Amino acid sequence: MERLLDNKFSIEDVHEESLRPKTLEEYIGQQKVKEKIKIFIEAAKKRKEPLDHVLLYGPPGLGKTTLANIIANEMGVDIKITSGPAIERAGDLVAILTNIGENNILFIDEIHRLNRTIEEVLYPAMEDKKVDIVIGKGPSAKTIRLTLPPFTLIGATTRAGLLSSPLRDRFGIIERLDYYTVEELSQIVMRSASILKCDIEKEACIEIAKRSRGTPRVANRLLRRLRDYAMVKHTGSITYEVAKSGLEMFEVDEYGLDLVDRNILEAIVYKFGGGPVGLSTIAAAISEDEGTIEDIYEPYLIQEGFLVKTARGRVATQKAISHIAKIKFKLKESGDNR
């Protein structure tokens, strides 16, 4: 079953398109990044040049794709969207590059997953606006260098450390997107509820924001699920009490942790004495993929002070130990033996 708090893109998030802001003014949060991007855009427009190449990095669900679309909109240019895994051959990338219009934007999501051979096609394209095409095979093969129109590459990644230095160094603008505050998320929830024509109390927006793991994508997903819950179980309006009872039914606690997060913490606390314990051991203990734990669950647990990464492994903090003990006590009181 799909995880409600998963900050990765899902099929259902296609419906989120209507919730996406279209301008920097509408874009809530990431204030420092916004201010810098606004300056770079205005300067590029005054010079009548394309924006310098941009690398956006940070955890999933924080608005990298949205920001790329906003940049295109603010620059008044078209954007071509693709992803690292979708570009399987160097020829695929060459075809995309040779079809980009002047000053337009190419957005590559998960750019860290580009094959190194394919990545090398980008070097002359980004630096010199040139791309090499090989015609023919064997000894008679010839290389023709084509000139590309000026363009902007926007790359997005959740793992900036996996980018090769030659690629990373070719980006003139590198910005990290951070987790959102509760206040910012509550504004996003209120705005989304208005677009969805969903009646919601301010206190309910704050409650959703508190449990959204600092991530707009999660906040919007919780809002849609609570809209369903309110329509079926209540009058349709999302009050504070409706939000609280709905989130409890979805097993999303006051810290924004779900069953999977708690399984990780419980394994470290009860099976391995609080740690330190290796990632592979945790993964085996809860039957979860190592990469999924490291990329999806751990960043938030570390950010919120539940987990510490050391050279010897993962260690549960006192906050984690207290929280897990409190949950166990509540379950015991309610007769739940989990």
Swiss-Prot record:
Similarity remark: Belongs to the RuvB family.
GO annotation, cellular component aspect: cytoplasm; Holliday junction resolvase complex
InterPro entries noted in UniProt: AAA+_ATPase, AAA_lid_4, DNA_helicase_Holl-junc_RuvB, P-loop_NTPase, RuvB-like_N, RuvB_C, WH-like_DNA-bd_sf, WH_DNA-bd_sf
Record-listed E.C. numbers: 3.6.4.-
Region (Large ATPase domain (RuvB-L)): 1-180
The protein's name: Holliday junction branch migration complex subunit RuvB
Substrates-to-products reaction catalysed: ATP + H2O = ADP + phosphate + H(+)
Free-text note regarding domains: Has 3 domains, the large (RuvB-L) and small ATPase (RuvB-S) domains and the C-terminal head (RuvB-H) domain. The head domain binds DNA, while the ATPase domains jointly bind ATP, ADP or are empty depending on the state of the subunit in the translocation cycle. During a single DNA translocation step the structure of each domain remains the same, but their relative positions change.
